[in-house]
């Protein structure tokens, strides 16, 4: 009787442990959603808005320096005609070092900086919707901050 009780006890213990382990191995929906949002932000930054073209430094051959991804860079393009407020440097975006999430979303949605100023050329005003702006901010926050 005691041997049977021991077997049942260990079987129940094994079953409970197996079930508990299977639940702990599955990522939560929130984590999965966060990963999807970050990936969507990466896609928008790298493939749609092309932020890396100005906000990532270039090497001697003109290639993007991946070790300094989105960490700010001198602007390499110049206007055909002089523009008084043309920016000479694109700020670091990796880790959002100089903007809050709300400020960054406002920049992307309205083209308005943290002090209420309009963005300087060559920065585009994207008029992004909230979901796109939020995804971009999630991606930028996921990157390590610039080390200048």
Pin down the residues of each PLM region.
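N-terminal export/targeting leaders of redox proteins
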Residues: 1-33
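Electrostatic cytochrome c docking/interface patches
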Residues: 25-47, 61-63
């Amino acid at each position: 009787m005691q041997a049977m009780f021991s077997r049942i006890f260990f079987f129940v213990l094994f079953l409970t442990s197996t079930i508990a382990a299977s639940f702990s191995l599955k990522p939560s929906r929130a984590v999965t959603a966060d990963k999807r949002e970050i990936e969507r932000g990466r896609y928008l930054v790298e493939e749609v808005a092309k932020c890396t073209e100005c906000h990532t430094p270039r090497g001697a051959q003109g290639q993007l320096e991946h070790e300094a991804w989105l960490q700010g860079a001198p602007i390499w393009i110049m206007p055909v005609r002089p523009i008084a407020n043309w920016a000479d440097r694109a700020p670091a975006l990796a880790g959002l070092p100089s903007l809050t999430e709300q400020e960054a979303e406002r920049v992307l949605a309205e083209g308005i900086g943290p002090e209420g100023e309009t963005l300087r050329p060559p920065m585009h005003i994207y008029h992004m919707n909230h979901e796109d702006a939020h995804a971009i901010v999630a991606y930028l926050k996921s990157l390590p901050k610039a080390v200048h």
